Amino acid sequence: MNRLGIIYEIQGMKAVVLTSEGEFLIIRRRKDMKVGQQVSFENEDIYNVRGKRFLYVAAAVSSVAAVLVVMFLYFQSAFLSNTDNIYGYICVDINPSVELVIDETCRVLEVRPQNKDGEQLISGLELLDKNVEDVVYELINRSISFGFVKADDNRKIVLISGALNDKRNELKTKKENDEAELTELLDNIKARVDRIDNIKVRTITATSRERKDALKYGLSMGKYCLYLEAQELNGSITIDEVHDMSISDMIEKLEQMKLALKDEASPKLQTTPTLGGETAQISPESMQHSTVPGLPETPSSSEKTIAPTLHGTPGVPDEKTLQPSTPTESSEYVQDGTKGLKIQYYSRKPHDSAGIDFSFRMFNTGNEAIDLKDVKVRYYFKEDVSIDEMNWAVYFYSLGSEKDVQCRFYELPGKKEANKYLEITFKSGTLSPNDVMYITGEFYKNDWTKFEQRDDYSYNPADSYSDWKRMTAYISNKLVWGIEPN
């Protein structure tokens, strides 16, 4: 029988614990034990069940002060374990979905099945206080033996996601270390699970906000992150459909979406540009989105034709050549009080496409809310055509209407790695600490000829989001993320 208690005292190879029933017990000490820690143990771990256990109770009762101290430690740990004692969350998705609550030593504090298959999977298992890598490995092997992973299924995919506990009051540097450690933990889990025959593992690092939103919709955080990725591609999957889809089906659907985008023919001009400075009506590559719950509506699939001048000729500046707006000389980060940003980006388009995809997501890594009217983001590239011959479109902005996002092209003279950049600014929006915002957009030449992006400074030909320092972010004209090109 698995039991829980708080360590009151450590004596050599023994530890004194106070159980939730108010009983003091002496148990075998483990190497990782420390005073005040909540631990799980079995009856066979208890020393002299019929003797010393009750003697220790009698001794403890004689010291009221000691009892009060221990009770304080116990209730502090019991009631605050959901905040300071919890380091993060690891979710295993196959079709059974199970969330594991872990402490800073990567021990499992709690096991939370997230669907009926998950309840069946963990039934009868003793998983508390075990290393999370061992637990994940055990769950996946059990999924195979239970038939959740079919022997004849060529798509044996396991999704493992992780998120930190945002309730932990820590310095920014410690938070960044935690993020790096979480990534390393997911990599270690993946490396171990990859040893299981024919199992393919995909890992996702989620934000605490994404995890909370996932819980609202009754999804695991990993599945919800796949849903968000689908929304950015074309929005053809709904929340209700996600509930009924397996992880393998979802990932296969995402791959089909990506291939469809790559296979799309280059957009054709509907009319030719006129001489009076008027801009032609064109059909850019479709990037449709259905409504994300809690977010503003995005263009429907019926909107086949988009005018590049949708936002007031944003891509046609007033002057023929513009200098960068208040550039910063430093290529290092400038800390602006407790404000910080991080950009994650990858291109969904091939290097020789007719449009450059600058869609990204941006995190508030600081301790203060950020007014996005003070923020600028830059995407750097090389191109011989004039900035007057390019235009842009924003299809989705998670913190408001796409019309609240403005873009402008700038020449970047004297640089080897880039000669132009697109600057993205915001008319509205507030990004709270630990929150994330999404932008979907692209820019293109007015004649819709193809770009060659392989030598573009900001181009990232990856297949999923990653921290991307070749896009820069500024708060009040101070560089807070990324490295400017040389």
Swiss-Prot record:
Residues 1-53 are cytoplasmic. Residues 3-50 form the RsgI N-terminal anti-sigma domain. Interacts (via RsgI N-terminal anti-sigma domain) with SigI1. The CBM3 domain binds to cellulose. Residues 265-336 are annotated as: Disordered. Residues 268-291, 322-333 have a biased composition (Polar residues). Ca(2+) binds at K382, E452, D455, D456. GO terms for molecular function: cellulose binding; metal ion binding. InterPro entries: Anti-sigma_RsgI_N, CBM2/CBM3_carb-bd_dom_sf, CBM3, CBM3_sf, RsgI_M. Residues 161-192 form a coiled coil. One of its GO terms (biological process) is carbohydrate metabolic process. It is a single-pass membrane protein. It comes from the Bacteria. Pfam families: CBM_3, RsgI_M, RsgI_N. Residues 75-486 are extracellular. Keywords: Calcium, Cell membrane, Coiled coil, Membrane, Metal-binding, Transmembrane, Transmembrane helix. It is found in: Cell membrane. The chain crosses the membrane at residues 54-74. This is Anti-sigma-I factor RsgI1. Residues 336-486 form the CBM3 domain. Anti-sigma factor for SigI1. Negatively regulates SigI1 activity through direct interaction. Binding of the polysaccharide substrate to the extracellular C-terminal sensing domain of RsgI1 may induce a conformational change in its N-terminal cytoplasmic region, leading to the release and activation of SigI1. GO terms for cellular component: plasma membrane.
